[in-house]
UniProtKB/Swiss-Prot annotation:
Recorded catalytic activity of this chain's protein: dTMP + ATP = dTDP + ADP
Protein name: Thymidylate kinase
Keyword Coiled coil: no
Domain of life of the native organism: Bacteria
Binding site for ATP: G10, P11, E12, G13, A14, G15, K16, S17
Top-level class of the enzyme under EC nomenclature: transferase
Originating organism: Stutzerimonas stutzeri (strain A1501) (Pseudomonas stutzeri)
InterPro entries for the chain: P-loop_NTPase (IPR027417), Thymidylate_kin-like_dom (IPR039430), Thymidylate_kinase (IPR018094)
């Protein structure tokens, strides 16, 4: 049986991690091998790169440096976690992947989408997620949720304009490829969001069997 690669995307405070855990629980109840992972990160080396990316520092990080670090972490993550899990037939649930790069570095930072696409092909080859869930909510709601968690990381310290661009980039990608994306209203109560997530499980099982 081939594996299934599902990514969960969205801006700050959208509840990706909570819903990833919920989806994993529901899939494991059906006897499936589920791997939970995240980006940036997912391996010891990639997690160290994550710290560089998220920790505020005195030295400003050049946008090209940020982009290359993201893909360096991704290359390690793919080699050590994602590809092996898919090869054994697991369902991989990943909190962020390359759509986040298009949204944050492309939309938020304004980097060339062509440059991102070149790195995507170099690092990933033809590997793309089978299904991407975008947890969408108003920027001010997401930032308020992020602030309530405590100290903000380097990205969470960006302003409204940055995150409006991130949100717009996500929705544009979903509109451009509706067969791969499902947009979930993350501004609802958690139980309503989880009902929407659970409603997608039959589709996931069909994709897994294809």
């Amino acid at each position: 049986m081939k594996g299934l690669f599902v990514t969960l995307e969205g801006p700050e405070g959208a509840g990706k991690s909570t819903n990833r855990e919920y989806l994993a629980e529901r899939l494991r109840a059906r006897g499936l091998d589920v791997v939970l992972t995240r980006e940036p990160g997912g391996t010891p080396l990639a997690e160290r790169i994550r710290e560089l990316l998220l920790t505020p520092a005195d030295e400003p990080m050049a946008v090209d440096t940020e982009l290359l670090l993201v893909f360096a972490a991704r290359a390690q993550h793919l080699a050590q976690v994602i590809r092996p899990a898919l090869a054994r037939g697991a369902v991989v649930l990943c909190d962020r992947f390359t759509d986040a790069t298009y949204a944050y570095q492309g939309g938020g930072r304004g980097l060339s989408l062509e440059r991102i696409a070149q790195l995507e092909t170099f690092v990933q080859g033809d590997l793309r997620p089978d299904l991407t869930l975008i947890f969408d909510l108003p920027v001010d709601v997401g930032l308020a949720r992020a602030a309530a968690r405590g100290r903000l990381d380097r990205f969470e310290q960006e302003g409204m304009r940055f995150f409006e661009a991130v949100r717009s980039a996500y929705l544009q990608r979903a509109e451009a490829a509706p067969s791969r994306y499902r947009v979930i209203d993350a501004g609802q109560a958690l139980n309503a969001v989880q009902c929407d997530v659970e409603a997608l499980i039959p589709e996931l099982l069909v994709r897994l069997d294809d």
